[in-house]
Amino acid sequence: MAQYDIRKQYLDFFASKSHKVYDSMPLVPDDASLLFTNAGMVQFKDIFTGKIPIPAPPRATSSQLCIRAGGKHNDLENVGYTARHHTLFEMLGNFSFGDYFKKEAIAYAWEFVTQVLGFSKDVLYVTIHESDDEAYELWCEHIEPSRIKRMGDKDNFWQMGDSGPCGPCSEIYVDQGEKYFQSDEDYFGGEGDRFLEIWNLVFMQFEQKGGVRTLLPKPSIDTGMGLERVIALKEGKINNFDTSLFAPLMQCLQKLTNKTYFGDDEIFDRLDLQEAEMIKIKNIQASFRVIADHARSVAFLLAQGVNFDKEGRGYVLRRILRRAVRHGYLLGLKKPFLWQVVEVVCESMGVHYSYLQERKRAIKEQCKNEEERFFETIESGMTLFSTELEKLQSAVQTQKQEILFSGEVAFKLYDTYGFPLDLTQDMLRERHIQVDMQAFEQCMNEQKSRSKASWKGSGDALKEGDFNALLSKFGENKFVGYESNKETCKIKALLDSQFKMVDTLSPSSQGWVMLDKTPFYPESGGPVGDKGALYSTNRILQSAQAQKFAQVLDTQKFFGLNLSQIEALSALKVGQEVFAEVDSIRFEIAKHHSATHLLHLALRTILGSHIAQAGSLVQPHRLRFDFSHPKALTNEEITHIENLVNEQILQSNAQLCENMDMQQAKAKGAMALFGEKYGERVRVVSFGDSIELCGGIHVNNTAEIGSFYIVKESGVSSGVRRIEAVCGNAAYHYGKNALLELSRARESLKAQDVLQGIEKIKMQLNEAKEKANKAKQSVKSLDYEEINGVRLIVLKLDSVSANEAKEIIDRSKNENESVAILLLSESNNKISIVAGVKNAPLKAGAWVKQVAQELGGNGGGRDDFATAGGKDIDKISQALNLAKDIATKALQ
């Protein structure tokens, strides 16, 4: 099978390049920060970060099993509905630890892709970081410069975190062709799926610390390539689930359900399908894919010792299984079945992962037992779900506003019938309905024993008992940073990086400090935690001799305690007096935080009172605000919202901060935010008409915010929109960059008025489209000759794209009983050839191939339709004559 061949080819190739082959590490990593192993570099993380010595040889390669179904990397909800998402996948990777770098990494990748995998360089493209001239020059030794695209940090810069190794990356793409990909975004660099990324080469050449990047003395290489994607490309499939890798699972499901599974390419060719039939096939297809994917995760997690549980990794496993069972239920499977699919996983993948075969019996039994537990309640749960849904649909018909699925019912499904929340949300997503999360969370909070999902956290060994011991010993440490960002404090407690109490912290070590009172505000409700420094107490006198004891990296609140994460610059000890000073970036955070309040008010004013905050992030350089709203905002709405926020800023409203009872706050009209916990006494922050419960840091007057720009509006999920915006210094730089881009646009368009320049280009495009339309409409008038009852058409058409030529061919085939047609067009020094044959003794694939070779190109396709390309423009006349000669001989 392809999976074994490609995996072996990859590992053998890099072994021949002096790499040591490493086995796939366990899916449960020895890394407190991770829920599951989610990338090939995880087992080498300590080498990259310098925690352990570089091994010999300093080169490694592996095929790593990865899980992405919880925590930061969670693809669970996308599985089954996209071509590439999986909860479990294999990542092929090669790594260099201070040994070879870009030149060899690029050369190895090119050699493997072209010589081992056999991809033609004509279908390969590459992206690099916009600043990486070295990578550009190296790639130019292998590929045409026109196939190299520079991208920004978002796409082509990798970093492990806020600190540590980082660097630019380069990605290799494969052009899957235009047959199945014909959207406006299907161009290299577009959002379409035609150009598929298969390999990411990360060049770790920097060390990032405190926002500063310095060159590493020994740069390293980290690469990753998805095995499932490579198999799909090699087998000519446009969806990973349609490959030989998943074929045994699809065959098993077809037998179990007595339903047929169609691949994406099969559906594409079924032009006779009605919409209702297509929807039915797509739903079956999605359920098959969910089950097949989840069966793999269940098999491997059980095999590696993860058990079904109410929390942690075991709960993620339970969620995966129950989501698969629910999709089986949709297919008519009303008794345990997944264990049979899991058995096929063990058999098909056990050839390479022998422990699947060895533990197959236990895996099947565990899976079947868990299924039986869920099937005991699924019928009752589905009845409850359907009953609530009927009520909801009746309400929708009588009320125009958005109706939410009862949070109480969702909780009952979870608590009584074992339906994980995301399973209920998954069932509702198909109907474009959301759960009332506020009501659900209220029920969850009342059920304390079920309120903790440990997989949500970072994985650090935070135990409530440890912090309660600190709390009972010292009490809460008071936050004093509202009035000042500086304070003389005493160190009450020190904790090392593993949260163990210590008496001292040595220089260069990281840990956590608890001050008796603190000016550092913890991360809460959106704003990131304060940073800063700890100095000797003579800092208060602005003494030049003041010593800097520690850098404050972050501030968090754990079980009522304000703790600051620090990096000690000199020895620190419990009881020591220090002068704590907050970094000046707090003012930029405060600007964005206050702007978030004004944005919330503007959204409710412009869009309506249904707007509710669904999440936020406030940083020194930007803000992100998620809110409930059923549809995308129009440009006009965005402009109104932005203008209203700026109007509030210009009103120079002073901050009014009051502490009062919750009932008083509600009577005042203060907005309480979803997900926040409030006591009996609350802090109310007001700026004019904006009144919210908030404990955070704000500007004293809205005028301090400066200006406000909305950078982006997008969808997060069904019924939730997101606005990203900037203000203060970030807004100044945003505006400056916008003016620079406008200037560049003028230069590019060669027009002082950008809009006029764009209109001119649009007119030119419309003229070209008109020419193309005329060509499409003149099918019946195309020059032709009749040979033995077959209409033969061989023509060169101007201003016609390959897609438009295909439309002409399709129309000719529809309008003629027997036809052989070949159209040739030339654009940008490239020649496109498209051919179609209907009821004629001529094969389109062979026809275009011979013509393309005459033009210095290549191509092919089916007997009834084929495409090709060429580059020798001066041979177009000879190529047309050749096309006629080939067809004439075949038809006589």
Curated annotation (Swiss-Prot):
Q: Tell me how the cofactor is bound.
A: Binds 1 zinc ion per subunit.
Q: What is its main location?
A: cytoplasm
A Pfam family annotated for this UniProt entry: DHHA1
Look up the record and name the cofactor or cofactors this protein needs: Zn(2+)
Q: Which GO terms describe its molecular function?
A: alanine-tRNA ligase activity; aminoacyl-tRNA deacylase activity; ATP binding; tRNA binding; zinc ion binding
Arranged from A to Z, the UniProt key words for this protein are:
Aminoacyl-tRNA synthetase, ATP-binding, Cytoplasm, Ligase, Metal-binding, Nucleotide-binding, Protein biosynthesis, RNA-binding, tRNA-binding, Zinc
The record's listing under HAMAP family reads:
Ala_tRNA_synth_B
Full protein name: Alanine--tRNA ligase
Query: What is the scientific name of the source organism?
Result: Helicobacter hepaticus (strain ATCC 51449 / 3B1)
